[in-house]
């Protein structure tokens, strides 16, 4: 009976490709494929976004090394708070612009996912992060201001934030977390 359970667990770890509605590449060791995926999506200079707790962990260096080996320059923004704040998003947006990045790779847990998605929401337009608040009318994104390409790499088992266009951001003035989103962010 134990052997059967082990076999079932092993089956879950087999490499798989899904679409939910975004493509999902799943399985141990798949980080090594990041350059191939970036090149396939036309990504030339991504901003890597993660939380403060993950910024110095080995998988960040591995990601940077895989990109570098494929001659894909990147920069790291590792300043996302455990519950992302507007100031984190503004600082990430500034780093995105200053580095002339064309994509965001969000890697880490839910906060990194939320930070990366929020930076994408505001990167190429003049909207505030609060203009994307879930209860508000959806902002119009013009063709000349598309969202940057977003790649999400979850390192924790959690809410599935990597599959959604929503993010949670904390408004310190109101002492509340708000859901921000746009249906075109994928």
State what each model feature region is:
Residues 47-48, 103-105, 151:
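Conserved beta-strand elements of the Class I
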């Amino acid at each position: 009976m134990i052997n059967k359970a082990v076999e079932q667990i092993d089956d879950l770890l087999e490499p798989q490709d899904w679409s939910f509605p975004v493509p999902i590449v799943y399985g141990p060791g798949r980080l090594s494929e990041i350059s191939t995926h970036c090149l396939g999506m036309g990504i030339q200079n991504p901003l890597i976004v993660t939380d403060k707790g993950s910024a110095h962990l080995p998988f960040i260096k591995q990601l940077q090394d895989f990109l570098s080996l494929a001659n894909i320059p990147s920069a790291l923004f590792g300043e996302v708070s455990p519950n992302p704040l507007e100031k984190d998003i503004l600082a990430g947006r500034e780093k995105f612009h200053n580095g002339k990045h064309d994509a965001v790779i969000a890697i880490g847990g839910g906060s990194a996912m939320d930070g990366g998605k929020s930076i994408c929401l505001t990167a190429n337009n003049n909207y505030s992060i609060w203009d994307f608040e879930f209860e508000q009318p959806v902002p119009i994104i013009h063709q000349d201001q598309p969202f940057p390409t977003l790649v999400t790499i979850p390192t924790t088992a959690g809410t599935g934030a990597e599959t959604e266009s929503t993010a949670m951001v904390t408004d310190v003035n109101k002492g509340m977390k708000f859901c921000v989103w746009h249906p075109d962010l994928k």
